[in-house]
Amino acid sequence: MEQHYHQQNQLRQLKQQQLKELLQQQSKDKEEDEQKHDDYRSPTKTTTTTATSTSAATIQSPIKSNEEDDEIDNSQHNNDTLQISEPEGESEIEEIWEHAFDPLPTSVSKNSAENVTNLGGINARVFSLSKPIYHDPNKLDLLLI
């Protein structure tokens, strides 16, 4: 009986030791992740973007009747600068922006009732119905897959 108790005690101590090591490793990993995020947030490279507008004030505010007010508002918008801090290397936003205006790839399946369109990794399926759907409170109108 004493031997069984001693084995159980050793097993319990071993589990506690493993749990402590696991918690220490998790806290260490968490600190490393936070450090990586802090490194990402720190400004290492500054990008300057200049925004210009042409006669935007007259389009945005047609109520104004005085042309001098329009010229003043327009001159204020001419040399707006925006400074963006980002880490060195190509960021995900730049990578997404490069492909923002690419045409979407489209493929049509052999079955004429189903068109599959790839929208940036999201598959949207469109089903054509031969009969209109009438509302029946006991049945679902549309089955989402």
Curated annotation (Swiss-Prot):
Residue spans of biased composition, Basic and acidic residues class: 27-42
Keyword Coiled coil: yes
Name of the protein: Putative uncharacterized protein DDB_G0280675
Coiled coil region boundaries: 1-41
Annotated stretches, region: Disordered: 1-91
Record organism: Dictyostelium discoideum (Social amoeba)
Superkingdom field: Eukaryota
Keywords: Coiled coil
Residue stretches of biased makeup (Low complexity): 7-26, 43-58
